[in-house]
Amino acid sequence: MHEITLCQRALELIEQQAAKHGAKRVTGVWLKIGAFSCVETSSLAFCFDLVCRGSVAEGCKLHLEEQEAECWCETCQQYVTLLTQRVRRCPQCHGDMLQIVADDGLQIRRIEIDQE
């Protein structure tokens, strides 16, 4: 389960930004999950709640956005969204010369803080 490690690292960054901006607490966090990150959203939410306990982000609202599996097809020269992450064929021309455009990581998109 690499979700716990991702959450621990995200919390480090969140705490750094909260301190930088004089936050008393973090009230919301928006995370974008890469289409090829192999992250289970339910596990991520559970782990995030767990690692935030006792921190400035305890009890904050977690917003998760899942990125689509976007690729560039060398054969038909267009961006396509894969029907599933497991099938690596272009849905337009059925070619297999795809370059993955979608991320395989986790991004902190936004942090909402309370300064009072």
Swiss-Prot record:
UniProt superkingdom: Bacteria
Residues annotated as binding Zn(2+): 73, 76, 90, 93
Major location category of this protein: membrane
One Gene Ontology CC term in the entry: GTPase complex
UniProt entry keywords in alphabetical sequence: Cell inner membrane, Cell membrane, Membrane, Metal-binding, Nickel, Zinc
Keyword Cell inner membrane annotated: yes
Subcellular location: Cell inner membrane
Description of the deletion phenotype: Disruption of the gene prevents development of hydrogenase 3 activity, does not influence the level of hydrogenase 1 and leads to a considerable increase in hydrogenase 2 activity. HypA-hybF double mutant is completely blocked in maturation of hydrogenases 1, 2 and 3. However, the inclusion of high nickel concentrations in the medium can restore limited activity of all three hydrogenases.
Matches recorded under InterPro entries: Hydgase_Ni_incorp_HypA/HybF_CS, HypA/HybF
Name of one Pfam family that matches: HypA
Any GO BP annotation: protein modification process
Regulation of protein activity: GDP-loaded state of HypB enhances HypA-HypB complex formation and nickel transfer.
A GO term, aspect molecular function: metallochaperone activity
Residues reported in the UniProt entry to bind Ni(2+): 2
Function: Involved in the maturation of [NiFe] hydrogenases. Required for nickel insertion into the metal center of the hydrogenase. Mediates transfer of nickel, but not zinc, from the low-affinity metal-binding site in the GTPase domain of HypB to HypA. HypA is involved in maturation of hydrogenase 3. It may partially substitute for the function of HybF and vice versa. May act as a scaffold for assembly of the nickel insertion proteins with the hydrogenase precursor protein after delivery of the iron center.
Family affiliation: Belongs to the HypA/HybF family.
Subunit text: Homodimer. Forms complexes with HypB and SlyD, and interacts with HycE, the large subunit of hydrogenase 3.
Protein name, as recorded: Hydrogenase maturation factor HypA
Source organism: Escherichia coli (strain K12)
Phylogenetic classification of the source organism: Bacteria, Pseudomonadati, Pseudomonadota, Gammaproteobacteria, Enterobacterales
Protein encoded by which gene: hypA
